[in-house]
Amino acid sequence: MSNTTAKNDGVNRAKLYQLALFPLNNGATNVYFVLILSYVAQFGSSILQLGLYASLMVTIMRICDAITDPIIGALMDRTSTRWGKFRPFMVIGSVIMAISVICLYILLPLVPETMMAMRYILFTLIYFVWVIGYTFQTSVTRAGQTVLTNDPNQRPMFTIFNTIGSMLGMGVMQFLIPLIKNAYNILDESGAVVVSGYARPELYAIITPIGIGVSVLLTILGIAEKDRPEYYGIGGSKQEKVKLSEYMEIIRNNKPMKRLMVAGAGCKLALAIATNTTVLLALYGILMGNYDSLYLPMMILGYVFAVPFFLLSVRTSQKKGQKASLQKYVGIALVC
């Protein structure tokens, strides 16, 4: 009976396959996270010749997540279509990101160097549009889980699948691109690398829409049965319409919400910096002198050491709650 979709006791429960498939939306967004946030700064500097502007724009846009996330969340809350509340945002977000990647990595380099002002403008606009699509999908991941299940006993299981989905999307791209990029290196007559494959748009502009399409399809299958109005309210209750002014009032006066927004934006910014290819090239290539030999082993070790923390944090959350788990393991991470 634990795999039934809903119960008469008012608790909304998900089937196992739904818990497994829906977090693949997180994996889908992480494919783009690696593709854009890890490589766009280097691409903007080496191919578009935008210098530090590319890195600066990426950093500023991550800070702006604290503003765009609640706005799109409010828009999602007021949306209800014949195709559901969440699926339209997933599909639209995926299309926006796919088009943005193609425009950024394939079309934008076609703008001649004599029109550098146009490159700056188009780079900013395209990247901003990509951020909107990215926020569409990440907001679905957070909001959709409340529709999928409100059973406290299923939340730890959802957390496990969500983490696996996130690691699949990010890990596959982080592992695959360095292996493939050697085929796109431009060498001189002596065999030395003149242009790194990381600076070649062909490396990732084709494989990403395919990967994201598969991930979104599986995600839609996971939530399709639950993306209906009777699951939008707690226990299937009818929701009241919330005015936009009420959202602003909550943001203005709710101090815990403000802290959450700042913390969320800060975590995203830190992750974007830590996984940026420019930073990793400086660390493993310049400081340690051997990027190709060090990057993949260090990345794999990072995932290996993350697994015990993940399992322990889930266990602590089940016993003492998510707040206690977060405080404990963030403290351990800071000490380490």
Please describe what each predicted stretch is:
Residues 2-336:
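Membrane-embedded alpha-helical bundles of multi-pass transporters/translocases
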